[in-house]
Amino acid sequence: MPTLSMFYGIIIRMYNEKGGKHNVPHIHAEYQGEEAVISLENVLLEGKLPTSKLRLVTAWIEIHKEELYANWTLLSAGEKYFRIDPLK
């Protein structure tokens, strides 16, 4: 699964899920063995993260929403993704 970004111990990944169980554009955020699936509209679809880390991820999604949608389109077409700047 392509790693788009990493910040504050959080790993953000996205991959092509054509026909997958989540039918909306989303990312996977991992932190210390926990994982959450979050839509690009900031809806928690599955899993969990500590509240403070979830807030960081949702802020990052808002900042980079256009880039995330661009990556979703690229990955859905089987093309190469690009990395996105971490939260600073």
Regions picked out by a protein language model, each given a short descriptive name:
Residues Y15-T51:
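A short, structured beta-strand/loop element
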